[in-house]
Amino acid sequence: MSRTSLEVKAQRKPKFSARAYNRCPVCGRPRAYMRKFGLCRICFRNMALRGELPGVRKSSW
């Protein structure tokens, strides 16, 4: 299946609530989804490095 059809399928209400899963709205990736930001780890990193996510900065210790 193509990624767009899987995104549409994920938006439908499942028969059982345990089957529901989150997808990144930018790229459609189902894994490594961060609920707090609503993005996958790859899109999160790209947007954070570009400064598009307020309050997020690269850690240093």
Swiss-Prot record:
GO terms for molecular function: rRNA binding; structural constituent of ribosome; zinc ion binding. It comes from the Bacteria. Zn(2+) binds at C24, C27, C40, C43. Keywords: Metal-binding, Ribonucleoprotein, Ribosomal protein, RNA-binding, rRNA-binding, Zinc. GO terms for cellular component: cytoplasm; small ribosomal subunit. InterPro entries: Ribosomal_uS14, Ribosomal_uS14_bact, Ribosomal_uS14_CS, Ribosomal_uS14_sf. Pfam families: Ribosomal_S14. Its cofactor is Zn(2+). Binds 1 zinc ion per subunit. One of its GO terms (biological process) is translation. Part of the 30S ribosomal subunit. Contacts proteins S3 and S10. NCBIfam families: PRK08061.1 (NF005974). Belongs to the universal ribosomal protein uS14 family. Zinc-binding uS14 subfamily. Binds 16S rRNA, required for the assembly of 30S particles and may also be responsible for determining the conformation of the 16S rRNA at the A site. This is Small ribosomal subunit protein uS14. It comes from Nitratidesulfovibrio vulgaris (strain DSM 19637 / Miyazaki F) (Desulfovibrio vulgaris). The gene is rpsZ.
